[in-house]
Curated annotation (Swiss-Prot):
It is found in: Cell membrane. It is an enzyme of class 3 (hydrolase). Catalyzes the dephosphorylation of undecaprenyl diphosphate (UPP). Confers resistance to bacitracin. It is a multi-pass membrane protein. Bacitracin is thought to be involved in the inhibition of peptidoglycan synthesis by sequestering undecaprenyl diphosphate, thereby reducing the pool of lipid carrier available. Its EC number is 3.6.1.27. Keywords: Antibiotic resistance, Cell membrane, Cell shape, Cell wall biogenesis/degradation, Hydrolase, Membrane, Peptidoglycan synthesis, Transmembrane, Transmembrane helix. This is Undecaprenyl-diphosphatase 2. GO terms for molecular function: undecaprenyl-diphosphatase activity. It comes from Clostridium acetobutylicum (strain ATCC 824 / DSM 792 / JCM 1419 / IAM 19013 / LMG 5710 / NBRC 13948 / NRRL B-527 / VKM B-1787 / 2291 / W). Pfam families: BacA. Belongs to the UppP family. One of its GO terms (biological process) is peptidoglycan biosynthetic process.
Length: 307
């Protein structure tokens, strides 16, 4: 009984950290490494080894889904509107002789006249770079870089880059809405998202910086980052669940449910306040925080507290 209570307590802590950090430009990975090492909730840690590495991976997937659900709830009107057939499919009553064919005309007309078509097209093309690089190389990247020193380096490099990019590009950014983002800008932002394959860099930070560089304002860049997370995380979760089957005990199932709910509720609050913050304040405070966390990860790694 006592062991189960301790387990649920650890689950709650993990859910809170996931909900707080998943969509902030501070790297949820860095925080999960620190917390997991301290409380013994990581692969190979004795208190959790009873539950197995597969369960830990599944738990990480499930709490990410909780955070994703928060985005779906907060932006339901936008997502639902973009899925309406009236906003998604252009009318092609007449075939115009444009030299690009029916399919080309359908795409061009849809992109230029249908908000939903444009929205999902931008999301899809922005996801392609990370899929192309991530699918074949993610395991190799993690094997090389999923250690305290590389994660700390990513945290600190990202912090310096964030300060530089904000000072140079933020004031130039004129695109204030996700609906104004062009397909070229979406592709570039998607390429920047690939930097998050380096553990500790932060997908949110990478995409927001990429958005600044191509002229997209902070709030629009952050929201586009949120929308990108939906297919990326759902896809990664589905892939993991297809490849792995785990027989769960009642306590393990309870742990998944609690972690999911905690991550959902915390992310719901954090994302809403994060957007309000970005409307008024610069992001350098997150850069300073990243530097501090990077130093902590380095020290803990050097002293063998985390590994």
């Amino acid at each position: 009984m006592y062991t189960n209570l301790i387990f649920i307590f650890k689950i709650i802590l993990e859910g809170i950290i996931e909900g707080v950090t998943e969509f902030l430009p501070v790297s949820s990975t860095g925080h999960m490494i620190i917390l997991g090492s301290i409380i013994g909730f990581k692969e190979g840690a004795k208190p959790v080894s009873l539950y197995g590495a597969e369960y830990i991976h599944m738990f990480e997937i499930i709490i990410q889904l909780g955070a994703i659900l928060a985005i779906v709830v907060l932006y339901w009107d936008k997502i639902f509107s973009a899925l309406k057939p009236s906003n998604l499919f252009p009318s092609m009553k007449e075939h115009e002789k444009s030299g690009i064919g029916v399919v080309g005309e359908f795409f061009v007309k849809g992109y230029n006249t249908m908000p939903g078509f444009k929205f999902w097209t931008n999301i899809v093309v922005a996801c392609i770079p990370a899929i192309v690089i991530g699918l074949p190389f993610q395991k190799k990247i993690d094997k090389l870089l999923f250690f305290p020193a590389p994660v700390a380096a990513a945290l600190m490099v990202g912090a310096v880059w964030m300060i530089f990019a904000e000072n140079k590009y933020r004031k130039r950014a004129k695109i204030k809405s996700v609906d104004e983002i062009t397909i070229k800008q979406a592709i570039v932002i998607g390429c920047f998202q690939c930097l998050a394959l380096w553990p500790g860099m932060s997908r949110s930070a990478s995409t927001i910086i990429g958005a600044w560089i191509v002229g997209v304002a902070t709030v629009a860049g952050a929201e586009f980052s949120f929308f990108l997370a939906i297919p990326m995380m759902l896809g990664a979760s589905l892939l993991f669940l297809i490849k792995n089957s785990v027989v769960l005990s009642s306590v393990q199932i309870l742990g998944l449910a609690v972690g999911f709910i905690v991550a959902f509720i915390v992310a719901l609050v954090v994302v809403d306040r994060f957007i309000s913050f970005l409307k008024k304040k610069p992001m350098r405070i997150f850069a300073v925080y990243r530097l501090a966390i990077g130093i902590i990860v380095l020290v803990l790694g050097f002293t063998k507290v985390i590994s």
